[in-house]
Amino acid sequence: MYGESLVKLMLALDVMDEKKAILIAKETSEYVDSIKIGYPLVLATGLNIIDKIKESTNKEVICDFKVADIPSTNEKIAELTLNHADGIICQGFVGSDSVSAILNVARAKNKKVIVVTEMSHPGATEYLQNVAEDMAKMADRLKVDGIVAPSTRPERLKEIKSIAKDAFVISPGVGAQGGNLSDVLNVLNENDYVIIGRAIYENENPKNAAKKYKIQM
């Protein structure tokens, strides 16, 4: 890892080509603490891409599948995913029984569960924001490992973090979505992660881009 930093850097690797994904992951691994991948890469390449990234970087890989189904289906998705990944992201709005189904699988495998409270895009203010605090309370009650809260709205990030006080935060929105890193760093601590994606992987030099952000943290 590069130096000692207060807040951790999570790379959102939303590319769709296996070779490109592994190359960027390798190039940036000195500066990132964790790698988050989602449906675009996994649907394009298969679940084995998780193992390939882990082997090539020695970093944890979190699957951002935002799982949102009934408990029995959530359990199946978690089982398949966590045979490979170090953690999985699920939606909180489906309720505590669906989240608990994922938690049960994760606990048996010693893996992480991260619950979405409020997303970073503008549309999240239409519906999701209205119940974000309730989902943060649920996350706190269930003792999930982490929560997702937006860098694009630092005041909301602060409020949500204060509710789910024992969970670490992964926070998207810095970079391409316009979130201000300095504002976010005033809220987060050494257990938390700033998520940066396009500003790194779309840069002509992803390694330097990752280094630039890491230095600021």
From Swiss-Prot:
This is Orotidine 5'-phosphate decarboxylase. Catalyzes the decarboxylation of orotidine 5'-monophosphate (OMP) to uridine 5'-monophosphate (UMP). NCBIfam families: PRK13813.1, pyrF. Pathway: Pyrimidine metabolism; UMP biosynthesis via de novo pathway; UMP from orotate: step 2/2. Gene3D superfamilies: Aldolase class I. GO terms for biological process: 'de novo' pyrimidine nucleobase biosynthetic process; 'de novo' UMP biosynthetic process. Homodimer.
